[in-house]
């Protein structure tokens, strides 16, 4: 069955974004928008879900949904297997882009910048507050590698459970966090007739420059 996509659209009428509402630096505005999303968005939407895009050595982009697990004035933190496809891509090309979309609020935030590993202490601190199943999974799963079937994954998990039957698992060396150090952050607010509000912050030296972009 062929479905027409031409008429699939919604009009955005909830709110606007003016320079008067926007602080001089982007972190305060992100904190405000993120708090709004946590209060407003309902399941299945996760306020901290984001698309993270990386690039491989051939220049081909790859993207996936991850969860934001840390935010401070340094940047935006997420965790993964360092030996995964994204980990290998970041090792070769340490730059990434993130996109948050909060449909109820009709808002989007795009973030671009350089990516660095967090300290082992930061990785361990987050690892230790994860559910036990997730901690075991970080050891069991050879992320991004080809496996025969689901049964193989279950066997790997059983072996990991047996390995740590008498002790708590430590954070694996191949697992940990990345922090995106933003060089550009764009705030997008949906508006009627596709004439959206776009406020862009770009890092120039040590200062943030704020500018409006045409929709």
From Swiss-Prot:
It catalyses: pyridoxamine 5'-phosphate + O2 + H2O = pyridoxal 5'-phosphate + H2O2 + NH4(+); pyridoxine 5'-phosphate + O2 = pyridoxal 5'-phosphate + H2O2. Gene3D superfamilies: Electron Transport, Fmn-binding Protein, Chain A (2.30.110.10). The keyword Transport does not apply. PROSITE patterns: PYRIDOX_OXIDASE (PS01064). Pathway: Cofactor metabolism; pyridoxal 5'-phosphate salvage; pyridoxal 5'-phosphate from pyridoxamine 5'-phosphate: step 1/1; Cofactor metabolism; pyridoxal 5'-phosphate salvage; pyridoxal 5'-phosphate from pyridoxine 5'-phosphate: step 1/1. Substrate binds at residues 9-12, 69, 126, 130, 134, 194-196. Belongs to the pyridoxamine 5'-phosphate oxidase family. Catalyzes the oxidation of either pyridoxine 5'-phosphate (PNP) or pyridoxamine 5'-phosphate (PMP) into pyridoxal 5'-phosphate (PLP). This is Pyridoxine/pyridoxamine 5'-phosphate oxidase.
């Amino acid at each position: 069955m062929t479905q027409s996509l031409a008429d699939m659209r919604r009009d955005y009428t909830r709110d606007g974004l003016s320079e008067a509402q926007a602080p001089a630096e982007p972190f305060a505005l992100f904190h405000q928008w993120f708090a709004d999303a946590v209060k407003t968005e309902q399941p299945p939407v996760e306020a901290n879900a984001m698309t993270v895009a990386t690039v491989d050595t051939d220049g081909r982009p790859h993207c996936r949904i991850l969860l934001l697990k840390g935010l401070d004035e340094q940047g935006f933190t997420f965790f993964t297997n360092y030996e995964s496809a994204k980990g290998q891509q970041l090792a070769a090309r340490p730059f990434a882009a993130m996109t948050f979309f909060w449909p109820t609020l009709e808002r989007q935030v795009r973030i671009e910048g350089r990516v660095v590993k967090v300290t082992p202490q930061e990785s361990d601190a987050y690892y230790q507050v994860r559910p036990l199943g997730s901690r075991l999974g970080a050891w069991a799963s050879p992320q991004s590698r080809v496996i025969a079937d689901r049964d193989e994954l279950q066997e790997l998990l059983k072996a990991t459970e047996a390995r740590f039957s008498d002790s708590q698992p430590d954070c694996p060396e191949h697992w940990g966090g990345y922090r995106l150090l933003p060089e550009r952050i764009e705030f997008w607010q949906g508006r009627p007739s596709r004439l959206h509000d776009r406020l862009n912050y770009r890092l120039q030296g040590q200062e943030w420059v704020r500018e409006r972009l045409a929709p």
